[in-house]
Design a protein with these regions (language model features):
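Short, well-ordered beta-strand elements within core beta-sheets of diverse protein domains
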Residues: 126-132
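Short active-site loop/helix that positions an aromatic residue
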Residues: 135-146
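Active-site and NAD+-binding cores of ADP-ribose-processing enzymes
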Residues: 1-85, 90-95, 100-114, 118, ...
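Short glycine-enriched loop/turn motifs at secondary-structure junctions
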Residues: 120-126
Length: 232
């Protein structure tokens, strides 16, 4: 994971140089890349506290830029008509004879934290809830199960929860010249974090997942900053 991530960052740096990126942008790309890789290196050396501290400092560096941190209803992670109510969905898999109640569709209670899994943004032992903005998104995330095993429910959020935006797409890259400098630099920082947190773990039964180190550290950093979650 670390070596592959380094290769991806090298590609980003080379592409930025080739496109004539300014010195400040190059400094952001190199600086953020090096610090994320350093965080991984420290984690592998069992210096977990300092590894997490590096990611926390990166989140603090991004600050309160509204492109990066905003309420659910105003976040750039969910483009569209702001006057319409945002709808989210939550799904669970279960046999046809299992009738899920409303309380079954929220996250595990803290009394059952021993059953919480090790997922991308889930801190082990701390139940969390994954939502999609469509039932189709839920179906994809649960592995495209048979309809008879798929249970989905709408979830209505108050909308004032502050979330960290990792829903960054390369399609935005074409529009960077239209943005002000501050937003371009914010986009670059978020993009480098997005690369580190977007790996797919192909081995289902693997206990330790290096690919989730930065993701889970980022979630802990967001909790310390008082954010309600991460959009990705």
């Amino acid at each position: 994971y670390k070596e592959d991530l380094k290769n991806k960052y090298d590609i980003v740096q080379n592409q930025a140089r080739a496109s004539g990126a300014d010195d400040e942008s190059m400094g952001i790309i190199i600086g953020f890349s090096d610090r994320i890789l350093k965080s991984l290196e420290l984690y592998y050396k069992a210096d977990i506290a300092e590894s997490n501290n590096i990611i926390l400092e990166l989140v603090k560096d991004i600050g309160n830029n509204p492109f990066a941190v905003n309420s659910v209803v105003n976040s750039d992670a969910f483009p569209g008509d702001r006057t319409n109510e945002l709808q989210f969905f939550r799904s669970r898999l279960g046999p046809p004879n299992k009738a899920f109640k409303a309380k079954d569709m929220i996250h595990l209670p803290n009394s059952m934290r021993s059953k919480s899994g090790n997922y991308r943004f889930s801190i082990p032992g701390n139940p969390s809830m994954y939502l999609a903005n469509s039932s189709y998104g839920c179906w994809i995330e649960t592995g495209c199960p048979a309809e008879i095993d798929f249970n989905v429910s709408p979830v209505l959020l108050e909308g004032n929860q502050r979330i960290f935006n990792l829903a960054i797409s390369l399609r935005d890259f074409r529009c960077l010249n239209e943005f002000e400098e501050e937003r371009v630099h914010c986009w670059l920082k978020l993009y480098l974090l997005t690369i580190a947190t977007s790996y797919v773990v192909k081995e289902e039964n693997r206990t330790f997942k290096s690919e989730y180190i930065i993701s889970q550290s980022l979630m802990m950093a967001c909790k310390k900053m008082g954010y309600g979650g991460i959009a990705y």
